[in-house]
């Protein structure tokens, strides 16, 4: 693809330029299609650029620092030219749509290959992939660049499964890192916390001990991360966990260590991921290389030049010198074909299950027979004097410090066109987002279909039926091999509030919670279902489940879940039940607002603080929800955060405090 370059080929600031990469594109030259991946800093789309299928990375530019980072990233990316580095095809470096355009890599990321498809590469495949990546790192380091986020999620695979090092959002020139050292930062009069925030970057489980100690980043930190990556490629295990599935990573990781505990163990105790076991075809020299790469002392780690030499030597030992031509990848050589055959023998499988769509289909089926001309849960008596709240509602959700979002939620005011019936719910996924995504689509239709029962019973049955439907759907996909992880058992906590005239019904399984502000004070509408609760512990044991003290608290074994009720988690049924606890509350004029939130909020904020923050915020429910979530993130919440705020009486958005 040859694209026309319009002169002057610079960014809006004039600081970025290229002779071969277009830096500003007419809007007619590209089309964004569906999102491929979403993160806290960018969204990646499948796109069409000048008639070619590409990947478009659209950064989230909320501050001037974000914009500065975009230009630094563009300057660096324009200077990269190596067969093992993801190629920048074009960029749009002018407002309002700042974007990067890259080749589209058919097989996704190495992380997906290992932990979604559960690929088990041969030693030949491991060596080819690691050697190509080592040469990409060698190229960067020899050009004075430190990547700072080497991990399988940042390795892309083409249709032949050759690897390409990608995502240079954190990459920096070594000279720039040396210029911004701690002493210079202090002399500028700036708080040292800002220095550490700018320099302690990357992904925790791949970060070198010196970075966790908040020392300066060097190329030796990339080597440490590369050693972790090689071991992960050999074992198929997410670092510091005992399971293959990426979806289970944060659950298992948290079961053993908090972030602080893991940091201390890596830095002070020399903790490392479980080393691959020596097998018949696994040379000891490769394991020695891994251990050398993750040495605590950076000076004892090999350079990228030495890593390449060692991997070439190991390859010759394994494959023989007569096949040494496979080591160099050129676009049209026979060695490419042979190498591709070696790497690709596992097939091109991608998990295609869309759990939102699966839930939506089932929801439509469940609601077909619902009679909507009958008033839902209508009152048995006509009392004109009965208090009926006037609602306004809003929500906010953020992935917080997580790399992915596993919460979902919905807000349905005036359900089925009933003026006084409203439904709200939050689903907090664990071991993946599948259960949460499915449940958010299914539950409303099931609640509507159960309108012939009482409102409380409708909620209860809807939870149980949603759980059953999800587990059946998951099993069906397992049987049809559309879900490749046989040991994948996703689940979610759930909390739903059904407001019928002046009655508020709350159903809950898990550790999300809901409170009312009643006459200025918090009024609990639910309680958390945790293994630390003696009643819940006894119930689980009575149902045949196991509760064990694991690291720091009671948990449901063997999965290590803290919650004792959930939707999904089919490996823990029936002990981890989906039957919710139901509360019924009669509302009055004393009730000011309802707050529902996932545990990412409640982990760092108590009921009184939540009430106080809303009282001190403009009375717009979405704004209140956002303020609570951002405050929780600022306080160090390590989880996804979802908040729903429902005002129960008329309020003015100009009113800041009561």
Curated annotation (Swiss-Prot):
Entries under PROSITE patterns matching the protein: PPM_2, PROTEIN_KINASE_DOM, PROTEIN_KINASE_ST
Ligand binding (Mn(2+) 2): 428, 599, 639
The record's free-text note on cofactor binding: Binds 2 magnesium or manganese ions per subunit.
Entry EC number(s): 2.7.11.1, 3.1.3.16
Transmembrane segments: none
Keywords noted in UniProt: ATP-binding, Hydrolase, Kinase, Magnesium, Manganese, Metal-binding, Multifunctional enzyme, Nucleotide-binding, Protein phosphatase, Serine/threonine-protein kinase, Transferase
Binding site for ATP: 36-44, 57
Matching InterPro entries: Kinase-like_dom_sf, PPM-type-like_dom_sf, PPM-type_phosphatase-like_dom, Prot_kinase_dom, Ser/Thr_kinase_AS, Ser/Thr_Kinases-Pseudokinases
GO biological process terms on file: L-ascorbic acid metabolic process; regulation of intracellular signal transduction
One matching Pfam family: Pkinase
Catalytic activities: L-seryl-[protein] + ATP = O-phospho-L-seryl-[protein] + ADP + H(+); L-threonyl-[protein] + ATP = O-phospho-L-threonyl-[protein] + ADP + H(+); O-phospho-L-seryl-[protein] + H2O = L-seryl-[protein] + phosphate; O-phospho-L-threonyl-[protein] + H2O = L-threonyl-[protein] + phosphate
Domain annotation Protein kinase: ranges: 30-314
Record: active site: 149 (proton acceptor)
One MF annotation (Gene Ontology) recorded for this entry: ATP binding
PPM-type phosphatase domain mapped to chain residues: 392-648
SMART domains: PP2C_SIG, PP2Cc, S_TKc
Family indicated by similarity: In the N-terminal section; belongs to the protein kinase superfamily. Ser/Thr protein kinase family.
Protein name, per record: Protein kinase and PP2C-like domain-containing protein
Species this chain originates from: Arabidopsis thaliana (Mouse-ear cress)
Organism classification: Eukaryota, Viridiplantae, Streptophyta, Embryophyta, Tracheophyta
């Amino acid at each position: 693809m040859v694209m026309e370059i319009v002169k002057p080929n610079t960014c809006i600031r004039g600081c970025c330029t290229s002779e071969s990469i277009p830096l500003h594109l007419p809007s007619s030259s590209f089309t964004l299609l569906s999102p491929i991946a979403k993160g806290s800093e960018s969204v990646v789309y499948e796109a069409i650029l000048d008639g070619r299928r590409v990947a478009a990375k659209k950064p989230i530019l909320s501050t001037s620092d974000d914009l500065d980072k975009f230009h630094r990233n563009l300057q660096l990316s324009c200077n990269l030219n190596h067969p093992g580095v993801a190629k920048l095809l074009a960029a749009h470096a002018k407002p309002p749509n700042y974007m990067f355009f890259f080749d589209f890599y058919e097989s996704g990321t190495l992380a997906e290959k290992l932990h979604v498809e559960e690929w088990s590469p041969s030693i030949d495949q491991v060596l080819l992939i690691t050697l190509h990546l080592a040469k990409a790192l060698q190229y960067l380091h020899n050009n004075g660049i430190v990547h700072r986020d080497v991990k399988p999620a940042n390795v892309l695979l083409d249709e032949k499964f050759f690897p390409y090092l990608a995502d240079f959002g954190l990459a920096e020139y070594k000279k720039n890192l040396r210029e911004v050292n701690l002493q210079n930062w202090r002399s500028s009069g700036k708080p040292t916390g800002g220095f550490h925030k700018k320099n302690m970057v990357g992904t925790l489980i791949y970060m070198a001990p010196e970075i966790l100690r908040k020392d300066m980043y060097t190329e030796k930190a990339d080597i440490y991360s590369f050693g972790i990556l090689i071991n992960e490629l050999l074992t198929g295990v997410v670092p510091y966990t005992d399971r293959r599935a990426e979806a289970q990573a944060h659950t298992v990781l948290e079961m053993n260590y908090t972030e602080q505990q893991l940091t201390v163990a890596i830095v002070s105790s020399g903790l490392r991921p479980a080393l691959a076991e020596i097998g018949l075809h696994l040379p000891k020299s490769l394991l020695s290389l891994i251990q050398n790469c993750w040495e605590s002392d950076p000076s004892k780690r090999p350079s990228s030049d030495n890593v390449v030499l060692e991997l070439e030597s190991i390859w010759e030992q394994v494959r023989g010198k007569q096949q040494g031509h496979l080591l160099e990848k050129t676009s049209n050589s026979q060695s490419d074909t042979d190498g591709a055959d070696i790497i690709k023998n596992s097939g091109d499988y991608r998990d295609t299950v869309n759990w939102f769509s699966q839930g939506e289909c089932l929801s439509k089926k469940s609601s077909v027979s619902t009679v909507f001309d009958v008033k839902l849960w209508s009152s048995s008596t006509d009392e004109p004097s009965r208090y009926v709240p006037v609602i306004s509602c809003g929500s906010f959700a953020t992935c917080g410090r997580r790399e992915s979002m596993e919460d979902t939620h919905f807000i349905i005011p005036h359900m089925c066109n009933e003026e006084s019936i409203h439904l709200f719910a939050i689903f907090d996924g664990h071991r993946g987002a599948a259960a949460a995504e499915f449940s958010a689509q299914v539950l409303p239709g099931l609640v509507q279909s159960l309108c012939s029962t009482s409102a409380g019973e409708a909620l209860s049955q809807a939870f149980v039926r949603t759980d059953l439907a999800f587990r059946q759907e998951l099993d069906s996909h397992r049987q049809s091999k559309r879900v490749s992880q046989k040991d994948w058992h996703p689940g979610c906590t759930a909390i739903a509030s059904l407001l019928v005239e002046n009655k508020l019904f709350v159903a809950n399984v898990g550790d999300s919670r809901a409170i009312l502000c009643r006459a200025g004070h918090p009024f609990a509408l639910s309680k958390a279902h945790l293994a630390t609760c003696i009643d819940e512990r006894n119930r689980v044991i009575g149902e045949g489940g196991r509760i064990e003290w694991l690291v720091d608290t009671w948990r449901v074994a063997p999965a290590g879940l803290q919650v004792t009720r959930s939707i999904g988690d089919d490996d823990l049924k029936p002990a981890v039940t989906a039957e919710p606890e139901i509360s019924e509350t009669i509302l009055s004029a004393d009730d000011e607002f309802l707050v529902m939130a996932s545990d990412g909020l409640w982990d760092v904020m108590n009921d009184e603080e939540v009430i106080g923050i809303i009282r001190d915020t403009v009375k717009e429910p979405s704004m209140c929800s956002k303020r609570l979530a951002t405050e929780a993130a600022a306080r160090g919440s390590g989880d996804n955060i979802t908040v729903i705020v429902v005002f129960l009486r008329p309020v003015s958005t100009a009113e800041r405090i009561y």
